[in-house]
Amino acid sequence: ASDVYKRQLPDANNHLVELLEREGAEAVVPDLMDFMFYCFYNQLYKADNLGTSKKSAKISKMGIKIIERLRKPAAEAFAKSKHFIPPADIEETARNASEIVSIGNQTGEGWFLTGEMLELLHTDTPNIVCTQPFGCLPNHVVGKGVIKELRKRHPEANIVAIDYDPGASEVNQLNRIKLMLSTAQKNLSKK
């Protein structure tokens, strides 16, 4: 879970997925398509609560339905599989996130970052690296700011927030990630 740029671009996150896999972890990267749903869904909230264009909300709702229809065959196949998890439903993600942060929180990754972390926790992925772009206050609020509440609601949550910026120490990032992985191993051996 993280800032979409830091999550999706290996050069922006010091090749985090490769690092996790080299350390023996299975990396689960939230779907980029879900970020598009988040952008569309925000328009629905704005029209209902902030007085923005109903036409924009209608187009966004149509966008959600079209993309859902296009990915429906894959979602159904994932649901039947033992090895894959079907894509999240944006309304469920929003409903889950709204228990912790307001859906009106739309700056940066907004409420969606919290929703993604909850989705990972609900799909038995308790070990989360929350990548943070340096100086992005909205991401720090909805990333680092909700970790305590997530741990309270999900004691199995093993979440580490990592700042990625040109001046950040790669060694510090690596040490914090390895500490999270060490905790994950200890928790796994308890099961």
Describe the function of each predicted region.
Residues 62, 190-191:
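Short, highly charged low-complexity linear segments
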